[in-house]
């Protein structure tokens, strides 16, 4: 029994030494894990939430919807265009309630996921949501910007779980293009 434990302990030490060598080698070479982990499936989660993605068409001005640089994808600002093609418009604190702003931000999240699906071909390639910059068309005395942009963040966390939690800014704007209620930019990290 004693010799079996010693043999097992020896194998563990050798195994740990091998793992340590591999970690050190990876740190020296800059190698990172680029494989999508088993069981990670934002596409299936999206379906289970009943969220349907939609075509985003071409940009309305001289820009592109997304730019990939290395393992980061930068998304242009997107508005709350609904499935019927209409934008949710108005100023928070004057024309729209916090709840309506939350719903507008949720629509933006669906639109950004649609852009990512078109850009990447598969939402399962998204490693994590890195940064969200939410802009709220708000009256000067409106102060609940975070509650509005929660509509966006809540979708990302619902779809990507812990990987959907992100750094964020939620700021008020005097106006947004076309009087849309909310505009959001996003940065995501992807698996190669």
Feature-to-residue mapping (PLM):
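Bacterial Sec-dependent N-terminal signal peptides
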Residues: 1-27
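Short, polar/acidic, helix-capping and beta-turn segments at strand->helix junctions
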Residues: 17-192
């Amino acid at each position: 029994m004693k010799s079996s434990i010693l043999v097992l302990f020896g194998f563990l030490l050798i195994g740990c030494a091998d793992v340590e060598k591999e970690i050190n080698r990876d740190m020296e070479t800059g190698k990172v894990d680029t494989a999508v982990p088993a069981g990670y499936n934002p596409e299936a989660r999206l379906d289970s939430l009943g969220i349907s993605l939609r075509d985003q068409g071409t940009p309305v001005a001289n820009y592109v919807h997304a730019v990939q640089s290395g393992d980061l994808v930068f998304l242009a600002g997107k508005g709350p265009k609904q499935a019927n093609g209409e934008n949710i418009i108005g100023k928070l604190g004057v024309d729209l309630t916090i709840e309506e702003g939350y719903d507008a931000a949720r629509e933006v999240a669906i639109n950004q996921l649609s852009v990512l699906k078109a850009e990447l071909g598969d939402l399962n390639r998204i490693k994590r949501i890195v940064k969200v910059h939410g802009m709220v068309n708000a009256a000067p005395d409106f102060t609940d910007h975070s509650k509005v942009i929660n509509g966006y963040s809540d979708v990302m966390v619902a779809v990507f779980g812990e990987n959907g939690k992100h750094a964020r800014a939620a700021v008020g704007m005097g106006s947004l293009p076309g009087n849309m209620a909310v505009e959001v930019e996003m940065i995501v990290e992807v698996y190669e």
